[in-house]
Amino acid sequence: MGDMPYSKKINPKTKAIVAIFVLVIIGVIIGYVISIFSLEIIITELNKLPIQINPVRIDRSINYYTGALICLGIEITFLIGLLYVYTDSFLKTKSRFLIGLNMFIIALFIKSLLSVFSLHSIANDYIRVSPYVSRTFLTPGFNELNFVVYTFEIIALGILLYLSME
């Protein structure tokens, strides 16, 4: 009666959904923490400006910046999850196809990491270079269109992770 073999196995679909949910939570936390630390530097640079910028525009720019870093955090955690799944599969099967997938995932991972650094660099440099022209600090390249692209990337990686874990 106490021996139920099916109770010890988790359904692969459930396992995939739980893993994706956990990776999203971890990605949100990572992106938010990175944004908190990098925004301190950006706000310090912003406070050095000789002009006064509308606080509403600053808040909007901070929200765009934080949202972009959260999206990148989710992408990074999904890519780590995919790398784990494909590396595990490669170790079991020794398939050359999985080597190619791992290389592709590593390239996307490096792109996402560099995007985090470039977002911070763009924001800092933009404050220093053109404070009088823009009157805000994150206008170039930071708008709703970025979040559409990030959303599609996250959905695509989530689907790939789900199908790979199933």
Which functions belong to the PLM regions below?
Residues 3-23, 95-105, 158-162:
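Alpha-helical transmembrane segments and their helix-start/interface "positive-inside/aromatic belt" motifs
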Residues 78-79, 151-160:
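Hydrophobic cores of alpha-helical transmembrane segments in multi-pass inner/ER membrane proteins
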